[in-house]
């Protein structure tokens, strides 16, 4: 079942000069978010900046959230990732979607107006209710942590 999410265009260029977010293929999990800029931005190596998307969303459903993720090609080819690594959009947030972009590469990277800079995925949310206990029921793994299963 498809969920409908309210999207507010906060910059009139979105839907005109810059396309609305769409799923690239029927199997795509993420929608591409674009840089809603007046002019190109040069992001020097090591720099971080906030880039507007021109969109605001209100998910409203407390059973959903959105995550903003890097685009794989920008990270792999250019070293450009999200400054906060992953952005979390709560269901009650209603402001403009901003993308923190970090150039962890060695070269200056130019972000062009309308360029796809990140992707957004909607995910289910479960809020935990904590129960204080003295001990846990034993499991096969137990307290095995980092590297507990080996490498091969």
UniProtKB/Swiss-Prot annotation:
Q: Which reaction does it catalyse?
A: dUTP + H2O = dUMP + diphosphate + H(+)
Pathway(s) served: Pyrimidine metabolism; dUMP biosynthesis; dUMP from dCTP (dUTP route): step 2/2
Entry's EC annotation: 3.6.1.23
Q: Give the required cofactors.
A: Mg(2+)
Q: Which UniProt keywords apply?
A: Hydrolase, Magnesium, Metal-binding, Nucleotide metabolism
PANTHER family, per database record: DEOXYURIDINE 5'-TRIPHOSPHATE NUCLEOTIDOHYDROLASE
Name this polypeptide is given = Deoxyuridine 5'-triphosphate nucleotidohydrolase
Q: Which organism is this protein's natural source?
A: Pectobacterium atrosepticum (strain SCRI 1043 / ATCC BAA-672)
């Amino acid at each position: 079942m498809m969920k409908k999410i309210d999207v507010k265009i906060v910059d009139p260029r979105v839907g005109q000069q810059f396309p609305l977010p769409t799923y690239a293929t029927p199997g795509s999990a993420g929608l591409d978010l674009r840089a809603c800029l007046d002019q190109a931005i040069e992001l020097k190596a090591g720099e971080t900046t906030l880039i507007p998307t021109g969109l605001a969303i209100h998910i409203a459903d407390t059973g959903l959230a959105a995550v903003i993720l890097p685009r794989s090609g920008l990270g792999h080819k250019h070293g450009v990732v999200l400054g906060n690594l992953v952005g979390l959009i709560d269901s009650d947030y209603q402001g403009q979607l901003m993308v923190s972009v970090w150039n962890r590469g060695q070269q200056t990277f130019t972000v062009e107006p309308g360029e796809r800079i990140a992707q957004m995925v909607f995910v289910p949310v479960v809020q935990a209710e904590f129960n204080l206990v003295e001990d846990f029921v034993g499991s096969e793994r137990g307290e095995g942590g980092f590297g507990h299963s080996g490498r091969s």
